[in-house]
A protein has these predicted regions:
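Metal-dependent phosphoester/phosphodiester hydrolase catalytic core
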Residues: 1-288
Length: 288
């Protein structure tokens, strides 16, 4: 699935933060040609040949897992606006994709529901130090934090219908995270009663981390504020580069975080340094 840098930074349905209409051409053309290049370059089967913009789809692995691939970037995302986060008309998925996704979850007969999508769904607070800082708000506005009404709708759908074993797989922010996705009753002391699902965020292979967006000062502040202000965030690594391996079986789904010592040596090896899992029929992470 694509994210924003196949077109322009912080892209949405009708534009992008890094696109100036007119002087950089028409957004509709830029998006069309970028998606054409993506489709021609990557071996991806389009779920709807009549609609080149639709990439959301389901991949089934027997009765073990359904993998839902979403488009939280280009298909029907409204422009980022943090002040509209609780507006029910402010969409990340859009109505058509959301209806499809909710129906698939509701009717799933697979043991695990793995959701691959672009931006972090778990809440992120910088506490009183950072929450009012515009640069930090802009970061959150591009995540599900900027579309809280839609996030709450998904959480309600999962819990009200007792949909189990939902695991979110995320990229975008070039850093590593292991998160419970909390409800309003989340408690750090008893996360099992307040988590709706879990999330693993993979870092980038070589691209810079959050310091490239936030600046080194805010990034350093964030590093010290994440755990005290976000008890549902179980692990975060803002510095190292690497990849994740997701291991799914009937007992549990586990994410192994692999990192390299340096990104400048082609023959450098990788090491698994952190392991988190969720058990079958549980909604909160455990450390392996």
């Amino acid at each position: 699935i694509w994210d924003d840098h196949e077109t322009a930074n912080d892209a949405y349905r009708d534009g992008a933060d890094n696109h100036t209409e007119g002087t950089e051409g028409l957004w509709v053309n830029r998006k069309k040609y970028a998606m054409r290049a993506w489709t021609e370059w990557l071996p991806v089967r389009k779920p709807n040949p009549a609609d080149s913009m639709q990439i959301f789809r389901k991949i089934s692995y027997g009765n073990l897992a359904n993998i839902y691939l979403l488009d939280t970037r280009l298909f029907d995302r409204d422009q980022q606006n943090f002040s509209a986060t609780n507006d029910t008309a402010h969409h990340l998925l859009g109505l058509a994709q959301r209806a499809w996704f909710y129906n698939e979850l509701l009717n799933s007969t697979a043991q695990w529901n793995i959701v691959g999508q672009q931006v972090m769904i778990a809440k992120l607070s910088g506490g009183i130090v950072l929450n009012a800082v515009p640069t930090f708000q802009n970061l959150k506005a591009d995540m599900w934090d900027g579309y809280n009404s839609e996030r709450q709708s998904l959480i309600d759908h999962v819990l009200n219908n007792n949909i189990k074993n939902v695991v979110i797989i995320t990229g975008d922010i070039h850093t590593s995270w292991a998160n419970d996705v909390p409800t309003n009753t989340y408690s750090a002391g008893n996360p099992a009663t307040g988590s709706a699902m879990v999330e693993f965020v993979t870092t980038s292979v070589t691209s810079p981390g959050l310091d490239a967006w936030l600046g080194s000062t805010i990034n350093s502040q964030l590093a010290t504020l994440i755990y005290p202000n976000n008890p549902h965030i179980k692990y975060v690594n803002l510095d190292e580069k690497g990849y994740n391996i997701l291991d799914i079986n009937k007992i549990r789904t586990q994410n192994d975080f692999y990192f390299v010592n340096t990104i400048t040596a082609p023959n450098d090896s990788s090491q698994a340094k952190e392991y988190w899992f969720v058990n079958d029929n549980e909604r909160a992470l455990r450390k392996a």
